Regions:
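Short N-terminal secondary-structure initiator segments
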Residues: 3-4, 75-83, 122, 134-138
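Hydrophobic membrane-insertion alpha-helices, especially the h-region
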Residues: 1-10
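Intrinsically disordered, low-complexity segments enriched in small/polar residues
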Residues: 8, 93-96, 127, 137-139
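Flexible low-complexity loop/turn motifs enriched in small/helix-breaking residues
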Residues: 11-116
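Short beta-strand edge/turn micro-motifs at domain boundaries
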Residues: 117-141
Length: 141
């Protein structure tokens, strides 16, 4: 019985656990671009984008509009200079009104390079007339 219990605990400990968002600190600045509900949806889009990160927890998600706009400007410049920015391309195709940069801090059971990273999103129209956040790219910004 003790051996079975030890094996069960070992399997539970090693079994990949889903992304934990139960203790996430969410920091959203005042926004002139997006409604509160849209920014709430942005946070949920990030959780969905990171759902594959097993044995990780999201410690903080931050949207700072001024910082986001500065990065959008840099990504547009990078794209215009031929450096292949996914966000810059999306902004040139759809306009900058839907562009947002989100900062995500994570802790994982085993260290991964992408624990703390930046995600670039566009709020894009869908066939049914709604708008949905679409991840354009991410990196260790």
């Amino acid at each position: 019985v003790v051996v079975v219990a030890a094996v069960a605990v070992g399997v539970w400990w090693l079994w990949p656990k889903p992304l934990d968002t139960s203790h996430t600190k969410v920091e959203i600045s005042a926004s002139s671009k997006f409604k509160t509900a849209q920014l709430d949806d942005l946070v949920q889009a990030s959780y969905r984008a990171n759902a594959g990160m097993k044995n990780c927890s999201v410690d903080k998600v931050k949207y700072d509009e001024r910082q986001s706009e500065d990065i959008v400007d840099m990504e547009i410049d990078s794209y215009d200079e031929g450096h292949g920015s996914a966000l810059g391309r999306a902004v040139r195709e759809h306009g900058r009104d839907g562009a947002a940069v989100l900062f995500v801090d994570m802790t994982c059971q085993e260290h991964v390079d992408d624990e703390d990273h930046v995600e670039w999103y566009m709020l894009l129209p869908q066939d049914d007339g709604t708008k949905t956040w679409v991840l354009q790219d991410w990196g260790n910004g």
